[in-house]
Amino acid sequence: MSVLVPMVVEQTSRGERAYDIYSRLLKDRVIFLVGQVEDHMANLAIAQMLFLESENPNKDINLYINSPGGAVTSAMAIYDTMQFVKPDVRTLCIGQAASAGALLLAGGAKGKRHCLPHSSVMIHQVLGGYQGQGTDIQIHAKQTQRVSDQLNQILAKHTGKDIERVEKDTNRDYFLTPEEAVEYGLIDSIFTERP
């Protein structure tokens, strides 16, 4: 099923110019991460962040997140780019930021991580399902544990929680209201109106 993307028409000195809504918002330094985090989405988000950095390395990038999570490698590529680019990346949860989405939400610039009032945040451990020979399963289990440890370290760094607390909380699905996400350190504030 194809999705129609709304168009926006702007008046310029040279006439009218039509943009799809996401391209128009990109001009205002807004990037949307919506749906499953996967390689294609990650490549688009990374390209947009790099483009915005080249346009103005001193102006914040706004990352709007509404995601149930997805592939850890894709999320880590986005996260690493968020940390790499010179502009601060402001994050805003609109709807949900679960799993990989919560990691990206927390990975925004300190003091610039936000939720809307009826959003939901969820953290948990890395999920994996493997089959095959026993030795292959052991290899994948070690890798899953290594990545899980890495993600817990990142969450501990951005929340200020000790690693033992993060490991305990991510052992199962851990849902947080925006107020709880502020208290936990995943975000800094809740937007009830435009700042």
UniProtKB/Swiss-Prot annotation:
Fourteen ClpP subunits assemble into 2 heptameric rings which stack back to back to give a disk-like structure with a central cavity, resembling the structure of eukaryotic proteasomes. The active site is at residues 99, 124. Its EC number is 3.4.21.92. Its main location: cytoplasm. Cleaves peptides in various proteins in a process that requires ATP hydrolysis. Has a chymotrypsin-like activity. Plays a major role in the degradation of misfolded proteins. Keywords: Cytoplasm, Hydrolase, Protease, Serine protease. NCBIfam families: clpP (TIGR00493), PRK00277.1 (NF001368), PRK12553.1 (NF009205). One of its GO terms (molecular function) is serine-type endopeptidase activity. Belongs to the peptidase S14 family. Gene3D superfamilies: 2-enoyl-CoA Hydratase, Chain A, domain 1. It catalyses: Hydrolysis of proteins to small peptides in the presence of ATP and magnesium. alpha-casein is the usual test substrate. In the absence of ATP, only oligopeptides shorter than five residues are hydrolyzed (such as succinyl-Leu-Tyr-|-NHMec, and Leu-Tyr-Leu-|-Tyr-Trp, in which cleavage of the -Tyr-|-Leu- and -Tyr-|-Trp bonds also occurs). One of its GO terms (biological process) is protein quality control for misfolded or incompletely synthesized proteins. It comes from the Bacteria. One of its GO terms (cellular component) is cytoplasm. The keyword Cytoplasm applies. This is ATP-dependent Clp protease proteolytic subunit. HAMAP family: ClpP. It is found in: Cytoplasm. It comes from Coxiella burnetii (strain Dugway 5J108-111).
